[in-house]
Amino acid sequence: MLVTNKVEKLEGKMTVPGDKSISHRAIMLSSISKGTSRVKGFLRGEDCLSTISCFRDLGIDIEDRGTEIIIQGKGLHGLSEPLNVLDAGNSGTTIRLISGILAGQKFLTIVTGDASLRKRPMERIATPLRKMGAFIEGRDYGNLAPLVIRGGNLKGMDYASPVSSAQVKSAILLAGLYGEGDTIVREKITSRDHTEKMLKGLGANISTDQGVTRLGKSELYGQSIEVPGDISSAAFFMAGAAALPGSFLITEGVGLNPTRTGIIDVLRDMGGDIEIHNLRQSGGEEIGDIMIRGKKLYGTEIGKEIIPRLIDEIPVLAIIAATAEGKTIITGAEELKVKESNRITAMVTEMQKVGIKVTELPDGMEIEGGQVITGGRVESYGDHRIAMAMAICGLFAQEPIKINDSQCIDISFPNFEEKLKAVVR
């Protein structure tokens, strides 16, 4: 059980674990590239370790040397039929992206996950992959894992995605590597583009223009990949520092991909004092140091246009909205309902337990600011981002906040508690 208490401010320099999205993709794409890849800054959280386990079961030699991960890639057609069921654990990224790769393999694979993952929707990837020619079956007509996938003989297609989801887009693009002809994915609101950037860096024939991504016939070649710090992990500290007057916090080496920096935009909209220093590029990804000075914040409106750029940061933004002056309204966030938990209902329920006035909306929530947070015992729902958001809530509470089942934080941030203790004052 994690317990957090009221603090005066956050202060110091810190780093955060490697980006989860990029870590997953580094293992997957290196495995289907020709030659050796070296990955530095890899996130050794449970989700990303599930990806390593799956690709080892597919015949890929992956060595963890501590400072780097070495992957001996076998090219697009070098994977082997697994002897056992692939286990994606709690990771939606693992099961959805690997399904795109498996759709191109001329063998049978069964892929499943834990109880939480087996409740999450898979039809969003099964439908387009079937249209490309893959056989995919599962519970609820292929909407729920375990999934049975037999691939091969795919055809490229032009697909207008009904959801703005990097996982859906990535699954289609990865299948497109095996398809005959070009594969095109269209999005109304552009989702994270880590897959596109890494594919390009590894040699793929890929281009993006105004929400339309086109992939042609490609071969991938192993590279050295540097994984930046995860802005979704940094967000908990950024939000906490921004809302605690007197704070001065620098998070170093954080990924600043424009499809992920919605958290910075919203904190600035709320009156936050945020500067970016030491901006640089590695592997097509922008990286920099984020400096935050704490001050009084004000309520804001967060709508559907920006949601894809901060979907994982909504829980902690909801917490600091309760400390800000005025009302904050979050809408267009339906995707939160199908994460590791229903993050809308979960956050509203736990925030109300600690005295916050918050109303659940069909696609978000409405939070009254300027409130006294009482403290108490709360649930994590086995969801790492709910647990960390409630841990930040404790920094503002009159009494300690005790979070049940807080070990789920290890999914994305194994040393979260130690990092937090190092900067609280």
From Swiss-Prot:
Catalytic activity: 3-phosphoshikimate + phosphoenolpyruvate = 5-O-(1-carboxyvinyl)-3-phosphoshikimate + phosphate
Keyword Aminoacyl-tRNA synthetase: no
GO molecular function, one term: 3-phosphoshikimate 1-carboxyvinyltransferase activity
Annotated localization: Cytoplasm
Major location category of this protein: cytoplasm
Residue positions of the active site: 312
Pathway recorded for this protein: Metabolic intermediate biosynthesis; chorismate biosynthesis; chorismate from D-erythrose 4-phosphate and phosphoenolpyruvate: step 6/7
Family: Belongs to the EPSP synthase family.
Record HAMAP family: EPSP_synth
Function: Catalyzes the transfer of the enolpyruvyl moiety of phosphoenolpyruvate (PEP) to the 5-hydroxyl of shikimate-3-phosphate (S3P) to produce enolpyruvyl shikimate-3-phosphate and inorganic phosphate.
Name of the protein this chain belongs to: 3-phosphoshikimate 1-carboxyvinyltransferase
Species, as recorded: Alkaliphilus metalliredigens (strain QYMF)
